[in-house]
A protein has these predicted regions:
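Glycine/proline-rich active-site loop of Rossmann-fold NAD(P)-dependent oxidoreductases
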Residues: 153, 166, 179-192, 217-218, ...
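Flexible, glycine-rich beta-alpha linker
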Residues: 125, 146-147, 171-189
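Conserved Rossmann-fold NAD(P)-dependent oxidoreductase catalytic core, especially the SDR/UDP-sugar
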Residues: 100-147
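C-terminal substrate-binding subdomain of Rossmann-fold SDR/epimerase-dehydratase oxidoreductases
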Residues: 202, 206-210, 214-315
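Conserved beta-loop-beta element that borders a ligand/cofactor-binding pocket
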Residues: 115, 120-121, 156-181
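A conserved pocket-lining segment of Rossmann-fold NAD(P)-dependent short-chain dehydrogenase/reductase
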Residues: 84-85, 141, 170-181, 193-215, ...
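NAD(P)H-binding glycine-rich loop region in Rossmannoid oxidoreductase-like domains
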Residues: 55-94
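N-terminal Rossmann NAD(P)H-binding glycine-rich loop of SDR-like oxidoreductase domains
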Residues: 7-27
């Protein structure tokens, strides 16, 4: 159990944050959620404390940290790739400057920190052809496709510098495509949208083709919770556990599972302009399994099945 631990979570109301916070509180830790908007439902969540604020606002950030006096920090707050593309200055303000302000505040305030976890991304990597048969390893070269990836590289650099300066155990955890309950925004939310469409017997056009490294959303929350609470020392970069499949394979598995529920994928198709998209896939997670052996990894088929059940109950 983690009673007595005080976990400061940025982006605690997002898809990943919601799942991570639930698991952290289940272990008895208090959570201080730092967000621009409050959670929709706080009933029965006596261990959750909402603090309103903006990552790019240095004063509100410092005030929030002073109020929380956290022992652990889970930094999930960020704009996603489409928002960074469409609003690059705001993306830089939140993803780059907000991250820098958080690390600086933690250093300046001499908080009683036992752990800092930074949510990075496989967007720091490049085309699959750059990497060997063992997959994309955390130590492999950076080669991002966009500003979002470059800002995540900067975040990883700040995380390592922070650990070297403070000796606070620090983890940068990378992930690729999240699917399942709670995933409703971002370009790669397409596969979750396809599952929802199947449940509702609606048509849906998938906007891209290619291969993706899939992570079940509840596993993602659990992965960040484990990186935050489980024993760890020093600094490390890790790939979140997941499974690589093509979009075609995802649709085929969705069809198999849909059939078990009397549903069909007949209305799911590719958009006419769907092109091969250079996603990062084949993430090597050997080091992750060694460092955090209790991280879960639900198979893609089981995750799709659980997602159908979740969206049916919600529908």
């Amino acid at each position: 159990m983690s009673k007595g631990k005080r976990v400061f979570v940025t982006g605690s109301t997002g898809c990943i944050g919601t799942h991570a916070v639930e698991l952290i509180m289940n272990e008895g830790a208090e959570v201080f959620g730092f967000n621009r908007s409050a959670p929709l439902d706080l009933s029965g969540k006596s261990l959750y404390h909402y603090i309103k604020g903006d990552l790019a606002d240095q004063q509100s950030l410092k005030a929030a940290l002073e109020e929380a006096r956290p022992t652990h920090i889970l930094h999930l707050g960020a704009l996603q790739t489409p928002d960074c593309r469409d609003y690059p200055m705001r993306g830089m303000e939140v993803n780059l400057m907000g991250t820098a302000l958080l690390f600086k505040a933690c250093s300046d305030m001499q908080l009683p920190l036992e752990r800092f976890v930074f949510a990075s991304s496989s967007a720091v990597n490049g085309p699959r052809s750059l990497y060997g048969p063992e997959g994309v390893r955390p130590e492999d070269p950076y080669q991002p496709f966009n500003l979002y990836g470059y800002w995540k590289i900067a975040g990883e650099g700040m995380a390592q510098a922070f650990q070297q300066a403070t000796q606070v155990p620090t983890v940068s955890l990378r992930l690729a495509t999240t699917y399942g309950p709670g995933r409703d925004r971002g370009f790669t939310a397409a596969m979750t949208s396809a599952i929802k469409a199947v449940v509702k017997s609606e048509s849906y056009e998938i906007p891209y083709r290619g291969r993706e490294n899939y992570h079940f959303s509840i596993d993602v929350g659990a992965g960040f919770a484990r990186a935050t609470l489980d024993p760890f020392s020093g600094y490390g970069v890790y790939n979140l556990l997941g499974e690589t499949r093509s979009v075609d394979e995802f649709i085929a598995l969705l069809g198999e599972e849909a059939d078990q529920f009397g549903l069909s994928t007949d209305l799911i198709a590719y958009a006419e302009d769907a092109e091969e998209t250079p996603f990062i896939y084949d993430l090597n997670d050997d080091a992750t399994r060694s460092a955090f052996p209790s991280m879960p990894n639900t198979s893609l088929q089981a995750g799709i099945r659980a997602s159908i059940q979740f969206f049916q109950a919600e529908n």
